[in-house]
């Protein structure tokens, strides 16, 4: 909130706090507004809007609807079927109207009564919507990835910090005890000196048999608006279908729209944990080199196999791989089908994934982190952490300054694969060293009339 401006919750508190007028005449204030009978008063509720309510966005909507201190006031989606499904769910929860439906996210963001939003849209829309949300003073729960380029991610960071809004990146593994504990084992040298981090990520998929020629737009879908800032391409159903439509969201594996498994489709999650354990949330690697396999035919053209090595200034190596490659590189990955983050020290190792943690020696699994050792921030619920920070104005467990560093690594990996050579990176200046070709890949043009 900008200085000198009263927000909605403060206004409601002031109204309730002055229920007796200047002449001593009592205003009539409903008991629910004062929190009677255990009800959360409106002054303590976070009013939310939801931008993107398909598969993942709809999941967020269901969760936030369950919080008594959240009021869902608006939903927005380009597809009518998603909008109607979402608003019907909200109205069932609240027993009637009170939730408005939008097709244009800008109209939702212009509402002064909305405190916070979720941003759960195709990757190439993230930066535009995130920056507009920040300009409108909206706190945001923002799904990964941060942006379609390193330059756009920095622009999101600048907007969030300039407008002082609360930001939670959708890397919910930071709110999982297993991941925090594994990182604390590494940070406190319980495995000895950390020297290598291996990351196993879900790969992208291929779609050689999917049509990449124009097909009729059977559902009257506004394809031009959906494309937005992305390069023009002929419409096909598969290009822009989503999981909520009962099919795989193929756009996730098209390089004009996403980095696929290397980035927002999965890689951001384990890379984020690698950064946390390495103590490098405010920086990044200094060298990057790797190879990958990129499909030559069909719609999908994000890397399906990759192995990218990063060297940090502290001497730690981080190797980001798809699951198939991870299984070949380290036998520990066979414990979990190639997924997870493996921390290797000179006295032991720990491997962690969402449903799994293992270590050697086994005594590490019951190790105690002492009071004078490194204790990482604790959150047991990523969405609740966001709501509590909206209220307290404190920093979330994964703020934008952390998010941009993780997101950057995924883009560095993609650039290294496509250039096929070693790259030197300056994490302070956030640019490649003496490499004009690589630096040109730090940004992507946007299709007119869209711009940041």
Which residues are covered by each model-predicted region?
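C-terminal structured subdomain/cap of oxidoreductase catalytic cores
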Residues: 53-60, 344, 350-425
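NAD(P)-dinucleotide binding in Rossmann-like oxidoreductases
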Residues: 298, 302, 306, 311-380
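A contiguous active-site-proximal alpha/beta segment in oxidoreductase catalytic domains
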Residues: 139, 147-225
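Rossmann-like dinucleotide-binding domain that binds NAD(P)(H)
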Residues: 224-316
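Active-site rim elements
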Residues: 169-171, 256-264, 292-297, 369-376, ...
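N-terminal glycine-/serine-/threonine-rich beta1-alpha1-beta2 phosphate-ribose binding loop
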Residues: 1-139, 151-166
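C-terminal helix-rich "cap/oligomerization" subdomain common to oxidoreductases
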Residues: 14-42, 300-301, 388-452
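Short basic (Lys/Arg) and small-residue
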Residues: 144
């Amino acid at each position: 909130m900008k200085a000198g401006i009263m927000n909605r919750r403060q206004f409601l508190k002031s109204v309730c706090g002055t229920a007796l007028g200047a002449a001593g005449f009592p205003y009539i204030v409903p008991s629910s507004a004062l929190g009677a009978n255990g009800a959360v008063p409106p002054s303590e509720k976070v009013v939310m809007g939801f931008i993107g309510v398909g598969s993942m966005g709809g999941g967020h909507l269901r969760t936030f609807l369950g919080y008594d201190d959240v009021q869902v006031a608006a939903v927005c989606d380009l597809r009518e079927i998603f909008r109607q499904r979402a608003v019907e769910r909200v109205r069932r929860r609240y027993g009637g109207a009170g939730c408005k439906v939008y097709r244009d996210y800008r109209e939702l963001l212009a509402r002064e009564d909305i405190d916070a939003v979720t941003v759960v849209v195709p990757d190439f829309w993230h930066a535009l919507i995130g920056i507009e949300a920040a300009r409108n003073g909206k706190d945001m729960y923002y799904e990964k990835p941060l942006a379609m380029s390193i330059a756009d991610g920095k622009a999101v960071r600048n907007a969030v910090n300039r407008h002082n809004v609360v930001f939670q990146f959708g890397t919910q593994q930071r709110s999982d005890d297993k991941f925090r504990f594994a990182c604390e084992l590494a940070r406190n040298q319980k495995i000895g000196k950390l020297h290598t981090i291996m990351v196993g990520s879900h790969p992208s998929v291929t779609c050689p048999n999917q049509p990449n020629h124009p097909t009729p737009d059977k559902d009257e879908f506004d394809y031009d608006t959906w494309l937005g800032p992305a390069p023009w391409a002929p419409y096909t159903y598969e290009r822009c279908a989503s999981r909520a439509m009962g099919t795989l969201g193929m756009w996730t594996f098209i390089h004009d729209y996403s980095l696929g498994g290397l980035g927002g489709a999965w890689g951001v999650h384990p890379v984020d944990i690698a950064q946390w354990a390495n103590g490098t949330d405010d920086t990044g690697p200094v060298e990057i080199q790797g190879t990958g396999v990129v499909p030559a035919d069909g719609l999908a053209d994000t890397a399906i196999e990759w192995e990218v090595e990063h060297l940090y200034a502290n001497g730690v190596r981080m190797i980001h791989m798809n699951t198939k490659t991870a299984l070949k590189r380290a036998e520990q990955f066979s414990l979990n089908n190639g997924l997870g983050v493996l921390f290797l020290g000179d006295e032991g190792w720990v491997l962690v994934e969402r449903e799994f943690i293992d270590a050697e020696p086994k005594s590490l699994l019951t190790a105690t982190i002492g009071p004078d050792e490194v204790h990482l921030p604790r959150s047991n619920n990523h969405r609740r952490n966001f709501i509590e920070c909206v209220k307290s104005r404190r920093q979330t467990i994964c703020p934008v300054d952390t998010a941009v560093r993780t997101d950057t690594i995924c883009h560095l990996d993609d650039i290294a694969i496509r250039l096929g050579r070693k790259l030197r990176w300056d994490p302070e200046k956030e640019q490649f060293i003496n490499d004009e070709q690589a630096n040109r890949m730090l940004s992507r043009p946007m299709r007119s009339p869209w711009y940041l």
